[in-house]
Amino acid sequence: MGLQPLEFSDCYLDSPWFRERIRAHEAELERTNKFIKELIKDGKNLISATKSLSAAQRKFAHSLRDFKFEFIGDAETDDERCIDASLREFSNFLKNLEEQREIMALSVTETLIKPLEKFRKEQLGAVKEEKKKFDKETEKNYSLIDKHLTLSARKKDSHLQEADLQVEQNRQHFYELSLEYVCKLQEIQERKKFEFVEPMLSFFQGMFTFYHQGHELSKDFNHYKMELQINIQNTRNRFEGTRSEVEELMNKIRQNPKDQKRASQFTAEGYLYVQEKRPAPFGSSWVKHYCMYRKTAKKFNMIPFEHRSGGKLGDGEAFFLKECTKRHMDSTDRRFCFDIEAADRPGVPLTVQAFSEEERKQWLEALGGKEALFHTFNRAIVPRPEGGAQLDKMGFTILRKCISAVETRGINDQGLYRVVGVSSKVQRLLSMLMDVKMCNELDLENSADWEVKTVTSALKQYLRSLPEPLMTYELHRDFIVPAKSGSPESRVNAIHFLVHKLPEKNKEMLDILVKHLTNVSSHSKQNLMTVANLGVVFGPTLMRPQEETVAAIMDLKFQNIVVEILIENHEKIFRTSPDTTFAEPTCLSASPPNAPPRQSKRQGQRTKRPVAVYNLCLELEEGDSPSPLKEDPPSSSQDSLSTPSPTTSAAHGPPGLDGNHLAADGGSCGDATATTPSQTRPSMVQWLNMQSPTTPSSNPAGTPPSPRMSPFPLSPAASIVDKLPECVINRKARAVYPCEAEHSSELSFEIGAIFEDVQTSREPGWLEGTLNGKRGLIPQNYVKLL
């Protein structure tokens, strides 16, 4: 579990648990700051100390390996997992370079040191300043409240009103500062991943160019660099979308905090001052408590908490409420007081004081006091305003008209669906489309009056205006679960299953839309709208959450993944029935058991394989590599164009642990454990092929393990090699696990495939065989000899 999201609505409650979450975020940023300072120091050692370069590299590599990113929420995307694991990959590169060290030019100041210093000073330094302001304002706010609440009720009304106004102004200023600080904390937590990894990427690229035999090494690194750049760009794109949503939510809560409160199990909660009576002659004292009341059980909880004493929780007290009575002005010299009586202590009222008259009335209503206010203290989900759009025959007509116009006139327009139209024109077009008579007369395919971006914006606006998102509130959580876990194949199966649980009209409209988006993505070389970019645009549109919270916004990236899966697997999901044996959504989060890892990946003895096998980018066709973006002026920060990127890869999960098989590796971006053969040192190319870490694409995309998982030790006794004959000649074999080829020299196959003429390969851990007339390499532990 990562860091908990900081909800803006909690800024107004300022509960003890909210303060605990803030401290957790602050501690993580301080840890990041210390780490970056240490990393900068290590980088300077590399520049200035050529003679001690080997030691400095080891320290630098160790620092990279030990640091782990924290994340907000309960899961990460595949891109974030690869970014998290990238530091481990960089560490492996450094360790490998130590044995091949050559005299090289160390021009890393501009590419590494300055960006890190800039990030630490401008971003982390800004958070420190915000923290100082926040702590200072907290002290000032609660000191003023303490002082204000001691004012006698017998003072002149004008004096009291002036004091009330001053306190209220101070509280509003405190809330403003709290909102800004919470927003900044979460922004930095999300920003630091790509802001930190990008300078590292530049550093490695620059360093390799200065090696005597860096040409072959750079080929290996370039492939990983390309994948990581895509991961970073995807994460950045999602961050931009998430940031705009967070800012919008923050502004909504700032404008009307009471109406934006989240659903809660408590009818009322907040701070109250409780009068604690002492023996004569000491009188009484007022102690601040955080109080919670559940009306259904009539249970009242209160916990002493003082913001200025380190924020430590005191021993709480709970009792069942008997009654609540408003305290009259002549019975106490304090304002906003009322009495509550516990069921187990009859006749012994407890006097408490609210922060204001309004809060006292709210507490009295919630507790069943005499003065009731028609305003519930209980938090509730804020209903979304419903537009005129409906999922009816007219809605299907609007959808088909817009799609037909887009595919006829603008399928190759750059930034399709990301470049937004003029708001007034979009609203006018949508109004015309929703009028039956005008809709029939409107010809969008041949009309030059309506720009393509106006049509696409109207289509998106129609989908957003539906009373319920196309993928429904009911199934929203179920769609998110498989996007957070499981292998790509299990994700597709889960979403396939859930799509067929949608109401028939929803499924039909979703089918039409996704088919269109599939067509749009097929023209991505012209319009730059890859599947990932379309996911960013349509994720929030098709899967908006019922309750707007920071936690829901953090799930936006997983909504995007769901839409990507729909686009990539349109034919399977909408044209075939789901597997009848597939479990209910409650089981979707469980990952399937892994098959054993490939022997060759664990052993790392690849000297007999061609270099090209481990430099997959050598054989990429020109059209397969992502093209850089041409930036068009964006209409909004969220709709700016982004680098096209591939999405979820193959449908077969990586084999994992099975009985006496080898232990599974740490993950698709994790370590590649190598065993160095006892012979003369191999050439640079051979050595790189032995030690080259597995790139993200070289793993048949499977269940993404946690980046914190350490690889199991390689045990020779557990090797599958011991269970097979030393020499296999002219045998048959059956596949016991599915596999997708990583190179043209390897075979792809499904479970149950029969191989002919199977022989032992020159590479340990691999066999050679023939399948459907094609001969190639087979992972030894994926098959069973017949």
UniProtKB/Swiss-Prot annotation:
Bias kind Low complexity: ranges: 634-649
Ranges where the PH domain occurs: 265-372
Keywords, alphabetical: Cell membrane, Cytoplasm, Endosome, GTPase activation, Membrane, Phosphoprotein, SH3 domain
Ranges annotated as biased composition (Pro residues): 702-714
Entry's Gene Ontology cellular component terms: cytosol; endosome membrane; perinuclear region of cytoplasm; plasma membrane
Protein's cellular compartments: Cytoplasm; Cytoplasm, Perinuclear region; Cell membrane; Endosome membrane
Post-translational modification: Phosphorylated on tyrosine residues, probably involving PTK2B/PYK2.
Ranges annotated as biased composition (Polar residues): 673-701
Keyword Cell membrane: yes
Residues carrying the site annotation Arginine finger: R418
InterPro entries, A to Z: AH/BAR_dom_sf, BAR_dom, GRAF2_SH3, GRAF_fam, PH-like_dom_sf, PH_domain, PH_GRAF, Rho_GTPase_activation_prot
Compositionally biased tracts (Basic residues): 599-609
Tissue-specificity statement: High levels of expression in brain, testes, liver, heart and kidney.
SMART domains per the UniProt record, alphabetical: PH, RhoGAP, SH3
Region of interest: Disordered: 584-609, 622-714
Entry annotated with the keyword Cell cycle: no
Domain spans labelled BAR: 7-262
Domain of life: Eukaryota
Start and end residues of each SH3 domain: 728-786
Record function comment: GTPase-activating protein that catalyzes the conversion of active GTP-bound Rho GTPases to their inactive GDP-bound form, thus suppressing various Rho GTPase-mediated cellular processes. Also converts Cdc42 to an inactive GDP-bound state. Essential for PTKB2 regulation of cytoskeletal organization via Rho family GTPases. Inhibits PAK2 proteolytic fragment PAK-2p34 kinase activity and changes its localization from the nucleus to the perinuclear region. Stabilizes PAK-2p34 thereby increasing stimulation of cell death.
Subunit-level organization: Interacts with PKN3. Interacts with caspase-activated PAK2 proteolytic fragment PAK-2p34; the interaction does not affect ARHGAP10 GTPase activation activity towards RHOA and CDC42. Interacts via its SH3 domain with PTK2/FAK1. Interacts with PTK2B/PYK2; the interaction negatively regulates ARHGAP10 GTPase-activating activity. Interacts with MICAL1 and WDR44; complex formation might transit from GRAF2/ARHGAP10-MICAL1 to GRAF2/ARHGAP10-WDR44 complexes.
Record's protein name: Rho GTPase-activating protein 10
